[in-house]
């Protein structure tokens, strides 16, 4: 799911940046701060700056922040390689290998949250804690009207949008914009399901953050939380490792602008 957020000015510069080889492509990354590593996975069509520009300075005060740009996004070149969640999750692991990071906390927003779920399933030994922000692990996690929009999306929707402006500012080849859009739109329109049974096997602590009107089906969200071990009476049994925060009066896009709120939940969870 995506929309056209306003551009966000990043307040600090990375301590290092570069490209890591990953499954036949070069994945762009930026590193900030020192401490325990936390990996940030952005939403569809976003760049690091657009998605995480306000949150990185806060996280980097006490942690090593590694922000990636997924296949075709931002600085990472467009590729005809098939766009699959399993391959993108493997790309994350390859970047970790390149940066010599054994394990890390992973934070994913929207499309990046889907990749974070996939990473948790296929690379559990590399995951410490998982933060999912307004993201689902199956198509049915979105409201029907959201899935209907995915199936009707056209490249023209993004013409001259802040998303295109952000892409043009950093993409190695701006002429790939339409090909990139076609690839992403095709992926968004395909039903997917990582599996209830698989989600229930995630052993890492999980924090889910959702906006009350972010397009996620809240009945499905409650089921997801239950699969992860939440939704219990903690007065009669131990507090679960899973946490759920539903932020009032927030849409899918506006949620990521609530930097202070999101940081307070994430910072407390990752302690």
Placement of each model-derived feature along the sequence:
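Alpha/beta-hydrolase fold catalytic core
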Residues: 1-38, 62-63, 271
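Active-site nucleophile elbow and catalytic-triad environment of alpha/beta-hydrolase enzymes
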Residues: 183-198
